[in-house]
Amino acid sequence: MRAVMALSGGMDSTALLMRLLAEGYQVSCLSYNYGQKHSIELERASANLSYLSKNEYIIDHRIADLSSAMGIFHSALTTDGFDVPEGHYEQEQMKQTVVPNRNAIFASILYGYALSVAIREETEVVIALGVHSGDHAIYPDCRPEFYKAIEHAFNIGNWDSNMVSFHLPYIAGDKESILRDAIISCERLNLDFDTVFRNTNTSYSPDSMGRSSGRTGADVERILAFHAIGRKDPIEYVDDWDIVLERALTIEKEH
């Protein structure tokens, strides 16, 4: 079985990679430098791929540099002087973290890559993405209807499109269910869950040492997910775990 996926270095795509490997897929990963303000996610992705390699899971990984084009897009994630908002991940101000048309661009490149692999290797290929229900409120390009429409358009616009299809296993789930799935995958692969997720970044505003602030919407969602499964997040935060957890729980209660 063959898969092509987007690996951001975040929690969701990392869990997806574990799932695909546990299911027996041969996986090729694309990461994107889209002009984001920090490269911590890409560094963490590389660290995880090195860990996988040491455990004899070899992943074909490429980084697509889109920074010259997407770096001029207006978003709190790409625009200097535009601060990343803090608070609950479904609050209105979190729309400031939307990068215009980002997932359409990413999906288009992935589709072309997957179709090329399918033709070259004469096999069917799935395009795997870690989008989930927690993103639906703020990010319209993470919703099921978006991927249904864009897959339809890509199918119309390409020969041999019957050889590729989108695979969105988390589309109806949330970060808690993603972590629970990852626990199972890591056990099947004989990998250490904490090591895998220590090599991830979810924060939109990590400090210069790569530590997560614990204050952005993405941080809060991640912290609450780890709390829900009864585990301490293995990444390093600017504040102690008890402090960031208490803050996240307060934000959740107030929301």
Predicted regions and their residues:
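Charge-dense, low-complexity polyampholytic segments
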Residues: I127, N199-Y204, R231-D239
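Iron-sulfur (Fe-S) cluster-binding modules
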Residues: V244, A248-H255
